[in-house]
Amino acid sequence: LEGDPMRGISRKPKLDDEPARLYDYQFDVDNRGKESILVDLQSEKGIGLIHLLCRSAQIFMCNLLPNRQQKFQLDTKALLAINPKLVHATLTGYGSDGPEAWRPGYDVTAFFGRSGLYDAMKEGSAGVVPNARPAQGDHTTGLAFSAAILAALRLAEQSGQGQTVETSLFETAVWTDVFLLFRRAVFYSPVRQRAREELLSPM
């Protein structure tokens, strides 16, 4: 078992007063203040450990595709049977149903690429696609995910019944660009922006 692959992207700091050790800044930034355990989901013991933790948990967050959740008994039905008040939250690339539900998704593919954001950010007909900032789509989708979880947690506390929420990189990206997409659908206006020198305000 190796755990999260992001742990392995390390480098030495350039600050003189820092100790001579490797920093995995991407993992540290996103996981500061958290405690981690490594679980083998290929074993019954590992799945049993997750089920044991879920008995007293309020929230279960998962980024596995729906078919893999079922394979490892981590789907909504399996976990709500263990803890009927649990909030089961799923974040995927393209959602849990529809023709793309089986497809893995990443920040640059599902959020920026398939949503059309890359193309929409080009300037003019011959514009260059800008580089996406690292994890910008991941972090934006994480905010939507946390808002859904908090709302579901509140409802679970009030009703005494477990809740299921989900979001995806693709759906969140579409929402961030909804004004341009709406304009395209209703007025047939181009989604792509004009070049900066053609605008009254280059900002």
Which residue stretches match the model-derived regions?
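Short, ordered coil/turn segments that flank beta-strands lining enzyme active or ligand-binding pockets
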Residues: 1, 32, 158
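Glycine-rich phosphate/diphosphate-binding loop of Rossmann-like nucleotide-binding domains
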Residues: 1-28
